[in-house]
Each structure stands twice: as structure tokens, then as C-alpha cells.
Amino acid sequence: MDKLKCPSFFKCREKEKVSASSENFHVGENDENQDRGNWSKKSDYLLSMIGYAVGLGNVWRFPYLTYSNGGGAFLIPYAIMLALAGLPLFFLECSLGQFASLGPVSVWRILPLFQGVGITMVLISIFVTIYYNVIIAYSLYYMFASFQSELPWKNCSSWSDKNCSRSPIVTHCNVSTVNKGIQEIIQMNKSWVDINNFTCINGSEIYQPGQLPSEQYWNKVALQRSSGMNETGVIVWYLALCLLLAWLIVGAALFKGIKSSGKVVYFTALFPYVVLLILLVRGATLEGASKGISYYIGAQSNFTKLKEAEVWKDAATQIFYSLSVAWGGLVALSSYNKFKNNCFSDAIVVCLTNCLTSVFAGFAIFSILGHMAHISGKEVSQVVKSGFDLAFIAYPEALAQLPGGPFWSILFFFMLLTLGLDSQFASIETITTTIQDLFPKVMKKMRVPITLGCCLVLFLLGLVCVTQAGIYWVHLIDHFCAGWGILIAAILELVGIIWIYGGNRFIEDTEMMIGAKRWIFWLWWRACWFVITPILLIAIFIWSLVQFHRPNYGAIPYPDWGVALGWCMIVFCIIWIPIMAIIKIIQAKGNIFQRLISCCRPASNWGPYLEQHRGERYKDMVDPKKEADHEIPTVSGSRKPE
């Protein structure tokens, strides 16, 4: 008699065996790497990388830099710095993560002496992640506030003070008085003139610029900003709720790791382009738009600016930070690629997309600002802003003057939301990837609790940034953590991989993935990796040290303890570089010279993660999947691949 077939609902255990396991649900059946998982599709990876690279800076920093550095002329140093600094580092990090299938800390099995560089990258990413989600919370608040028939910052209201005005305000004027029968003309405060029913003499008025309604709304309503960092105040409850919502969105998108975030980015990475196109089309139809675009990249371009070193420094700095190199995220995201993926073409696509997006965003921004300048009777130079002032003061002010202002405001802030979210996805993935590499068994069983736990801890740490002094904290972290630490990590990354591990050896590793290339293909990359890119990064680092100034927010200086805290944050991030180097040297054997030499050799478990990809060069490497060898081993006796 034939064996009875079991009903389908009895086959759940059998199905689990086929598809990795219920504990390891972030790994798909067809994944090449059944331990860590891979991207479901190539497009998941590309959109995640584009979303990570294209962030808020592309919208609120690049257009202003272009305008202030000669307009269209700025694109020349920008393109040159992309080729000399941005793309070489981007390609290197993508290749590094993909080759070893490891995150930014464990990937330093390539050079155990420099493992602290990876820790520095992750710590800086953590600090930046804390305040970056606060900016997303600001965007959420403004988006919700826009769901009204009239934007709340369109006019001065009960929350504003006497300085709220779109036109200059009279502060003093001359009045005619009679004293003991003698007529006198004296200068008085305008408030005194009004109280005493005097009239200003025509032409005697002294003016000061008024504060736009959008500026007072930002400071008095949205932030409830205190007088300085010394005055913490209370937690602004609606910003705290928006921050919580932002973290809930991030946690929900990452609960299955790259398997879930790789689907969400189809919306978060592509939607900003739709909004930018809509804003550009709308802006181009407005009166004065052509003047704004002319200031941005047209007839106002000043090629004499190319003689100024500041312009080249700004171009290099913008490229370096906008591509998100040396943050650890590129290594983390690339570690989930299949081994034979063409990371070279990916690097080209993402870098070009990032730069073209910056240029495109500038047209959308300046067309609207040109219209704002036109209706207010000002020059474009008087209304253009950068950073927070552009996103939450200048642009909202311009949108408030448009017919259907709430609709355009909702679109704009929803775009900022999506721009921030996919950058945040990659930053959190950097943290969870680091945990996964260090504790793989724990991560398989507890990916969801660990991911949500990270989000919860970072939310709690971010609450200080939604107090009445929150904006000062945001600016402080950005000023210290998102600067020198990243430059130091990038310089040491190049020195370690190219000069110590060996640029030629790294090229051989890369060719195992993308195939052998002719010598002329690598000529450019060798020139950049060995000489040009390190020199540029060192020059930027020295320049930033020379140009360092105490942080301030507007005209408000930071207290001494705030500056000291900023230095403590950056020292905490980079101190792990010497600490880990000392630990590795202590773990090694022999005299100090022998220990140093052994620490500069790859660990015994460095190489392709899967045995099928190791070939002759890595046939003797220790299997990284074995628990005993998962941690970076003592480097004495490390194998040096031929």
C-alpha cells in the first residue's frame, strides 16, 4: 500500500530545513552565504548604497557651496576631487567589505594592528546616528505642522515678538520736541516715540533687519530654543514623539536586516527624485526663478574663484563627506554582496548618482529661492542659506508664499524625511553588522531584539537633543564627531591597506572578485591609492586644524564645558586606534620588533568567507566560520598569503 501523503500543514519542519532556519530568517534559500545572508537583488544593494550616500547634505549644503564658490565654476574642482579622492576611497571600501564578507571592525583581520580604525568608524557612526535621527524628527514635525489650510509660519502670530517682520524694522528715529520754548531735534528709541505719540521725521529712521516669521517659528515654536547650552530646559514633548516615531520607522525597516531594508529603499531612495523633479518644475514656472538659477550655476559663475584654495578645500570636503566614506557603512553594506559581484561598476554608478543628485537638487532649491527674492525685492544672495537655516527657515519661508503652500511644504519635508531615513538605515546596519561579526550565534537567534534594542538605546541617548537646548547638542556633535575623526580613519585606512598590507596584494584580492584587468586599468587607482588621495586627505586634515574655531550656534558661543565635552567625544572615538594597536602587540610573541611585524600581517582567518572562493592564494586560511577562530586571533604565526 502506498504511503499516505502528509497534509501541507505537517511539513513546516521540513520547510524550515530548506530555508535556513527560523532563527536565521534574514538568510534566504538562494543566498550564497548561508551564515550572513546576501542581498536579494543587485538593485537592493545599489539603492541602499545610493540612499546611504545621497543624504541631507546633497540638498542643504551642496547648492550653497556651489553658489558661494563661483557657481558653475565650482563643478570643476568638485569633479576633480570626485576622481582623485571620493571614488578611489569608495571603490576601496566596497571591495574590502565584499572580499571578506565582514563589517568595518572584523574586516581588519587584514591588518590587526589597525583594528581600532574600524572601531573608530563605528563609534563615530553611533554618535552621528543619534543626532541624525533628531533632524529626521524635525522633518516629521514640520511635515505634520504643514497639514493646515495655512502654514503656521506664513505670518507673525501670537508666538512671535516685535522683531518679527519681513521688512526692516525701525529702531530709532529723530523727533522734534520743544524744550523751554526752544525746538530741538533729538534721536529716540522707536518704542518711546510710539508710546509718547510722537512722529518720526522723514528720512531719519534707523533700520535693523527683521526676523522672518519662519525664523521665529523655528526658534520659538519648533525648537523652543533656550538662550544657550547652559540652559537645558525641558524635553520638547512633540519633538520627543517625532523622534520616537523616527526610531520606530527605522526599527521596523531593519527588523529583518538587509532583507527588509532592501525593500524599503525602493521607496525611500527613489521618492526624493520624484519630489525634486516636481519642485523643479513648479519652481521653474515662478517669476524670478531664472534669476535664482543664474546665481546658482548660470551667468553669475565666477571662474576667478578657482584661484582660491578655499574653493578646492570645500570641493574636496563636500565630496569626502557626501559619499559617506570612512564611516563603516560602505564596508558593512558591501559585505552582503555575492563574492563575484562587480563592485567597481557599483562604485562608479553610486558616486556619479550622488554627484548628479547634488547638482539637480540645486536647481530645485535655487528656483524657489529666486522667486522668494523676487517677491521680497531682495537679491538672491540675501535669501540663500545653508544647513538648518535653508531647510527650516529659508525654504519654508519661500514655500509659504506659494499658492497651495501646505501641499508643497508636505512634499518638501517628506522628501527630507526619506533622504534621512535611508542614510539612517545604513548607519544602524553598520552597528548590527559589527555585532553580527563579533557574536554570530547570538545575532542569529536575537536579531530582532538586538536591532530594536539598539534603536531604543539610541533613542534614549537622543532625548538630550530634543530638549530646549537640543539644537546646541546637535551642532556640537556634528562639529566634533563628523570631522577630524573621519579624516583620521580614512588616512589610516589608506596607509594600512595600501602601504602596509600592500596595494598590489589588495589589487590581486579585488581581481579575484571582478576578474583580471590590464595593467593600465589599475594605473589610475594605484596613483590615487598610493599618493594622490592620501596627500589630499592629509591636506584637508591640516587645513581643518588650522581653521579650527570654537563652535557657536549663530551668535551664541558654547560654554567651556561644552567645548571640553566635544573634545572628549572625539578623543573617545579615536583613542581606540592606539589602544587596539597596543593590545595586539601585547598578544603577539617575540621581541617588540617581531611583535610589530606580526601585527602588520593578516590574521590567519583573513580571506574570502566561503571556501569555494579562496582559490590557491587562500587555500590554507583558517575557516572564519569556526567559533574558535571567529575572533581575530593572536597574530603571531599569521599566514601571509602568496
Swiss-Prot record:
Entry GO MF terms: (R)-carnitine transmembrane transporter activity; alanine transmembrane transporter activity; amino acid transmembrane transporter activity; aromatic amino acid transmembrane transporter activity; beta-alanine transmembrane transporter activity; branched-chain amino acid:sodium symporter activity; neutral, basic amino acid:sodium:chloride symporter activity
Pfam family, one: SNF
Keyword match Nucleotide-binding: no
Extracellular side stretches: 131-234
Residues bearing glycans: 155, 163, 174, 189, 197, 202, 230, 302
Tissues in which the protein is found: Levels are highest in adult and fetal lung, in trachea and salivary gland. Lower levels detected in mammary gland, stomach and pituitary gland, and very low levels in colon, uterus, prostate and testis.
InterPro entries documented for this protein: Na/ntran_symport (IPR000175), SNS_sf (IPR037272)
GO BP terms, alphabetized: (R)-carnitine transmembrane transport; alanine transport; amino acid import across plasma membrane; amino acid transmembrane transport; amino acid transport; beta-alanine transport; glycine import across plasma membrane; response to toxic substance
Transmembrane segments: 45-65, 72-92, 110-130, 235-255, 261-281, 315-335, 348-368, 399-419, 450-477, 480-500, 528-548, 563-583
Signal peptide limits: none
PROSITE patterns according to UniProt: NA_NEUROTRAN_SYMP_1, NA_NEUROTRAN_SYMP_2, NA_NEUROTRAN_SYMP_3
Lineage top rank: taxon: Eukaryota
Keywords: Amino-acid transport, Cell membrane, Glycoprotein, Membrane, Obesity, Symport, Transmembrane, Transmembrane helix, Transport
Membrane side Cytoplasmic: residue ranges: 1-44, 584-642
Basic and acidic residues biased stretches: 622-632
Family of the protein in this entry: Belongs to the sodium:neurotransmitter symporter (SNF) (TC 2.A.22) family. SLC6A14 subfamily.
Disease per UniProt entry: Genetic variations in SLC6A14 may be associated with obesity in some populations, as shown by significant differences in allele frequencies between obese and non-obese individuals.
Other known facts: Transport inhibited by BCH (2-aminobicyclo-[2.2.1]-heptane-2-carboxylic acid).
Identification of the protein by name: Sodium- and chloride-dependent neutral and basic amino acid transporter B(0+)
Source organism phylogeny: Eukaryota, Metazoa, Chordata, Craniata, Vertebrata
